[in-house]
A protein has these predicted regions:
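Alpha-helical segment proximal to the catalytic Tyr-Lys
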Residues: 129-130, 171-172, 232
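Short C-terminal tail/terminal secondary-structure segment
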Residues: 3, 147, 224, 235-251
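Short, small/polar-rich loop/turn modules that mediate ligand/substrate recognition or access, typified
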Residues: 174, 179, 234-236
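Active-site helix of classical SDR
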Residues: 124, 158, 166
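Conserved glycine-rich cofactor-binding loop
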Residues: 8, 15-16
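Residue(s) in the substrate-gating loop at a strand-loop-helix junction
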Residues: 142
Length: 251
């Protein structure tokens, strides 16, 4: 029931990292994929080439700079013009700067809330507007939306907002046969993570019940389930994929 043959999916922020892992998993399940990136680059073309080797469905690219909210409508207008509506939307694109509250400017806050919260809201709105037969929306949130980390107050707030927006939009869009769910990833392995944040990685490995970092595939497998017909009676849900870290007592 996790087969996606005949489905078309748009994954934002999908040239690398979690977004690419999700796009790859959906392709492997039979979906036709639209990769999204801010601008064209060798990395985007390489991502497209890697996915194209896995499918005969074709892989396309949607470019849109999310610092401009108008790009959301532009992406969906192009999809409509191509006369190939999408069935699945994964709102993955986000930013995660580290900044102490005392050093935070109003522009820092505005940028964070615009890209991490306003853009997924607008993408959801246009998905619903252009949808012909319903579908599935998945918001990639963070465990920081549940338990914040030091110097991440604006990031944690944006993700907490997205978790609640998931529930609110699921309530509103159910009558249109649109399901909306979210995933809260834990610490996911990436290149140079142990060099960029050695103490954080060390602490995670000591505390996490499964004693490992997450991988992109861990999030991708959860994403596949939630956007597929296997989850046809699930909407407004938030799935925590963190190796059990949420269970660790803080006392």
């Amino acid at each position: 029931m996790t087969e996606l043959t005949g489905k078309r999916a748009l994954v934002t922020g999908s040239k690398s990292g979690i977004g690419f892992a999700i796009a790859k998993r959906l392709v492997q399940a039979g979906a036709e994929i639209i990769l999204h990136a801010r601008s064209d680059s060798a990395e985007v073309e390489e991502a497209k080439m890697k996915l194209a080797k896995l499918t005969t469905q074709g892989v396309s690219i949607a470019l849109g700079d999310f610092s401009d909210p108008k790009s959301c409508r532009s992406i969906f207008e192009k999809i409509k013009k191509d006369n190939k509506p999408i069935d699945i939307l994964v709102n993955n694109a986000a930013i995660q700067p580290v900044c102490a509250l005392a050093d935070m400017s109003s522009s820092d806050i505005s940028q964070m809330l615009e890209i991490n919260l306003q853009i997924p809201i607008m993408m959801t709105r246009y998905f619903a507007e252009y949808s012909e037969k319903g579908g599935s929306i998945l918001n990639i949130c963070s465990i920081e939306g549940l338990t914040p980390a030091l110097n991440h107050s604006h990031y944690a707030s944006s993700k907490a907002g997205l978790i609640n927006f998931t529930k609110a939009s699921a309530l509103e869009l159910g009558s249109k046969n649109i399901r909306v769910n979210s995933i809260c990833p834990g610490l996911i392995e990436r290149q140079n993570l142990d060099k960029d944040w050695p103490q954080g990685v060390k602490s995670w490995l000591e505390k996490a019940p499964l004693k490992r970092l997450g991988a992109g595939n861990d999030i991708a497998n959860a994403a596949l389930f939630l956007v597929s017909d296997a989850a046809s009676f699930i909407t407004g849900a938030n799935l925590v994929v963190d190796g059990g870290m949420e269970c660790v007592p803080s006392w």
